[in-house]
Every structure is written in structure tokens, then in C-alpha cells.
């Protein structure tokens, strides 16, 4: 209650004046071998680490793990046709890294996708620039990953696919990631549905969901 805090802040009868020990927003109050001490606010993204009995706490950088996760989910189906890389629907998300040394793990999963027996290629973009693509070799196209359209003679089948890439943006500024696609001969790409769109209950006509995820991870 207020009366007890007033007494603590005014050092009670023989304590240290808390008001003169912690002076800045974000300060942490702790006791060392002689009395109360101030630990100033740490670097953004760092955590408070105990060093055990007889040692003072410190701010420390995480040695691994996920710092934050952003995701985009597409539950509806759509089609797209282009022979050159173009943004794939609304597959887009933004993330702001907390450290320039951290990486961004990009993951995409398409519940069902087909391109009428033709190959489709996909790339990730970071603020409009392609990332995570294969090395240049002659005149060959470069992509993050590709799929081949289903080879079923019946067009009511489609398969899911997934891909993961680790990006190294080396920034603490906001980043927008997107997925782009291109299809062989500009054929139609079907997302979250098969080519044949029969309105029946057979599972091969299933509508599916697709997900795009960005996770900041400590390298």
C-alpha cells in the first residue's frame, strides 16, 4: 500500500533511499554484497540473467530460440496466371527484427496447389528484392522452390507442398516479405483447390488452407 511504499522509498529507518538508487525508466533494483544497487535498462530484446549465488544479475542476449512470430493465413481459394514472377495473391507479412545479428525463418505451406501439369516456380521477396534463390548458372531461371502440376488424368486432384528458408536481413528496420510465383507457359496456378472445381463432397475436391510464417530467431 501507499504508506509502506512511501516508507521504503524514503529508506525506512536505516535502508537505502530507493528514489536515488533507481533514477531512470527501466531501471532494475537489486542487492549486491553491500546494499541496494541499480541495473540500468538493457538492450532491446535482451533478458535478465541471474549468475547464481554471490553474483549480480546482468542483461544477456538469448543464446537461441524464437524471438517473435508473424503469420498470414489464406483460407479461400484463388487462381493466378503469369509467366514472370508476380506477387502471389495476398501472401505478405511484415516483421521488425530486434537485432541485426538475428535471422528470419520463412516457412510456407500450401494445403493444395496445382498448375495443370506444368511447373510453377516461387521466390521469396524482402522489401521487393528476391531472396533465397538458387545460384546463377548460365541462362537458367532462379527460384526458391518449384512444384510440378499433378500428373493425374483426372483434374480433380491436387497436392500440398511446403518450403523453409533462413534469411539474414542484418537490420532492425521493418521488413515486408512476400511470395511471388511464375508458371510455365503462363498456365493457371490453383491455390487451395484442385483444377476441377466440382461442387461435390468427395475429398479430392477439398478446399484447404495455406500459411506463410516469418519467425525471428537467434543465430
Model-identified regions with their sequence ranges:
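Extracellular repetitive beta-rich solenoid segments
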Residues: 1-65, 100
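Terminal beta-strand-rich extracellular "head" domains
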Residues: 72-73, 79-84, 96-174, 178-219
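A generic structural signal for well-ordered coil/turn residues at beta-strand boundaries
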Residues: 25, 44, 68, 157-159, ...
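Extracellular receptor-binding modules and their adjoining Ser/Thr/Gly/Asp/Asn-rich linkers
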Residues: 65-74
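Extended, low-complexity regulatory regions
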Residues: 91-95
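Short, solvent-exposed loop/turn segments enriched in Ser/Thr/Gly
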Residues: 87-89
Amino acid at each position: 500500500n501507499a504508506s509502506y511504499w512511501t516508507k521504503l522509498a524514503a529508506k525506512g529507518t536505516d535502508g537505502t533511499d530507493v528514489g536515488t538508487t533507481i533514477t531512470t525508466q527501466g531501471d532494475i533494483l537489486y542487492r549486491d554484497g553491500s546494499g541496494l544497487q541499480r541495473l540500468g535498462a538493457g538492450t532491446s530484446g535482451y533478458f535478465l540473467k541471474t549468475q547464481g549465488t554471490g553474483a549480480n544479475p546482468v542483461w544477456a542476449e538469448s543464446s537461441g530460440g524464437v524471438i517473435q512470430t508473424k503469420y498470414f493465413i489464406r483460407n479461400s481459394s484463388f487462381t493466378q496466371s503469369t509467366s514472370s514472377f508476380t506477387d502471389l495473391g495476398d501472401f505478405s507479412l511484415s516483421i521488425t527484427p530486434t537485432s541485426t545479428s538475428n535471422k528470419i525463418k520463412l516457412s510456407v505451406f500450401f494445403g493444395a496447389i496445382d498448375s495443370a501439369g506444368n511447373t510453377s516456380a516461387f521466390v521469396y521477396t524482402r522489401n521487393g528484392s528476391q531472396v533465397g534463390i538458387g545460384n546463377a548458372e548460365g541462362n537458367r531461371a532462379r527460384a526458391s522452390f518449384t512444384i510440378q502440376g499433378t500428373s493425374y488424368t483426372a483434374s480433380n486432384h491436387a497436392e500440398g507442398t511446403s518450403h523453409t528458408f533462413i534469411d539474414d536481413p542484418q537490420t532492425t528496420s521493418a521488413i515486408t516479405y512476400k511470395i511471388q510465383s511464375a508458371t510455365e507457359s503462363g498456365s493457371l496456378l490453383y491455390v487451395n483447390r484442385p483444377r476441377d472445381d466440382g461442387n461435390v463432397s468427395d475429398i479430392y475436391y477439398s478446399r484447404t488452407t495455406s500459411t506463410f510464417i516469418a519467425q525471428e530467431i537467434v543465430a
